[in-house]
A protein has these predicted regions:
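Short, Lys/Arg-enriched, Trp-marked, Pro/Gly-tolerant hinge/linker segments that flank
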Residues: 121-127, 140-177
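Generic protein-terminus/edge-of-domain signal
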Residues: 1-61, 65-66, 73
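Short, surface-exposed helix-loop/turn micro-motifs enriched in polar/charged residues
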Residues: 27, 52, 102, 143-146
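Juxtamembrane/interfacial segments around transmembrane helices
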Residues: 38, 112, 136-142
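A hydrophobic/aromatic-rich effector-binding and dimerization subdomain
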Residues: 2-7, 66-134
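Generic anion/oxyanion-binding catalytic loop in active/binding sites
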Residues: 24, 46, 99, 140-143
Length: 177
């Protein structure tokens, strides 16, 4: 399913707090990049051809047009208020950094990160990823230029950490017809 995201404010960055009884999105893709931070939930994460369990603290960066979905564990479908999905999702336009990446050396590592994101990137838990997660929580309360700046800081941290792994071995792009 191709998801068309609405950036109603005209901003290239969108952040949302997710509070669901279980994940409800089918397998989908969109042109925007997406950072998903699972605060509370467990289940299976589907990214391209990769299927792996996810737990609380899971942090991934998904590239443009990379198919993905999350399937909650069965306990989340039993209407138990103790089992809820809480997550932060930060989405940004693939054109957001296009000029800066091509013209400023300060964005070289971010450019490499976004190229790697086409495979899906899982960030292993460590001090650096804790800092990224804290910045995502902070970003929930930001708007306008402050949100844009925080997004750049988050991507900068992601680009410098060594504690990450690609989720797919091959570049995965769905056929759009």
């Amino acid at each position: 399913m191709h998801e068309q995201l609405n950036f109603s404010t005209g901003s290239p960055v969108k952040i949302k707090w997710c509070d669901y009884d279980h994940f409800k999105y089918p397998l989908h893709f969109h042109s925007e990049y997406e950072i998903v931070y699972i605060i509370k939930s467990s289940g299976k994460r589907f990214v391209g051809n990769n299927i792996e369990p996810y737990l609380e603290g899971d942090l991934v960066l998904l590239g443009s047009f990379l198919p993905h979905t999350y399937k909650s564990d069965p306990v989340y479908y039993q209407n138990n208020p103790d089992f809820r999905v809480n997550a932060i999702v930060l989405q940004f336009s693939k054109n957001f950094f296009q000029y800066a990446i091509g013209n400023y050396p300060e964005f070289y590592k971010v450019k490499n990160l976004l190229e790697e994101a086409q495979y899906g990137i899982y960030f292993k838990s460590c001090k650096e990823t804790d800092s990224i997660k804290n910045k995502l929580k902070k970003a929930l309360n930001l708007k306008n230029i402050d949100l844009l700046i925080e997004c750049i800081k988050i991507l900068s941290l992601m680009s410098t950490t060594e504690n990450k792994e690609l989720l797919n071995e091959d570049y995965f792009r769905p056929s759009i017809r």
